[in-house]
């Protein structure tokens, strides 16, 4: 974590707490807030283009609706993977052209097809006969992309059970595209983020999409778009990229050689996760909670939870551990306290007994009511998953650290 990120947190905590007085604590001073280092987005983009120079990232908008993040990626040259009309409208509202959008949801309402046709969004994904016939009826000139089944058995949240055409269906779907006199722009797959690196899932997906291309050419179609999907994380990207490059060169040798292959990908978490840090406030502390089993005796209750920015704890059982404690505007890094700090559990703000962020962690110094806990890697599937359960709202404040200047001189933009 850079010094400028830490200073942004410390300065904001000092600011909001300075507005309070004895007996009068402003609600705004207790709201969780983010710090977003947009320079990290630019670094990620550069790393992507170095590892996969011929692959254009189409950012998976579902992972984050943050407008400043999206604008930064647009400036870098990204396209955008949208799965709903609302996501499409978000991208267009930022002045980004429709030609930079791919509509990737394989099963769509008719109204969304009408919107795409009106706006000129041409790349549309499908994975079954019914969807293709719906496209033919409502948007016959669409540039269709056949999504094939591709999954990794180690995935925490596998998508293959929901979307993707099986190999046995390739031939029939390709022939139906030809019969309906439609265009097959290409093929795609999606291997969701996995708990272990299985680059073989991407290689399988590339081989299957190459088979779609081959069958399409046999019936007189001319696909040119290969979409290698998403699922990339900081810990897996380089290994996946190392497997993807030779697989594309092998399976699409003629297309690559003739310069007629357009390659896309749909990274979301890779770009949206690490730039964002979240600070939550400790609103209550309970000690001697020994009657609840083997958990630590101290419970800390925070002003956030699984129905707000920690939904991934509920969806994929992700563990969240604070990177720092801020007390009276002073930062206390937690790297040295993982083994010798105070044992405690962290609980969310709702009345749901499942709203537990971490059942056993160690923090130091001893955390008090009013302290702040800072979590890193909080940009993906956080604000987009917020609910109003128990009446709690999540109008989170974000402090943006702008890219393009030296970190030591970069000024935070407070919005």
Swiss-Prot record:
Pathway: Alkaloid biosynthesis
Subunit structure: Homodimer.
Family indicated by similarity: Belongs to the Orn/Lys/Arg decarboxylase class-II family.
Enzyme Commission code(s) on record: 4.1.1.-
Transmembrane segments: none
A matching Pfam family: Orn_DAP_Arg_deC
Protein name as it appears in the record: Amino acid decarboxylase lolD2
Stored PROSITE patterns: ODR_DC_2_2
Induction: Expression is induced in loline alkaloid-producing cultures as well as in planta.
Requisite cofactors: pyridoxal 5'-phosphate
Residues reported in the UniProt entry to bind substrate: 315-316, 352
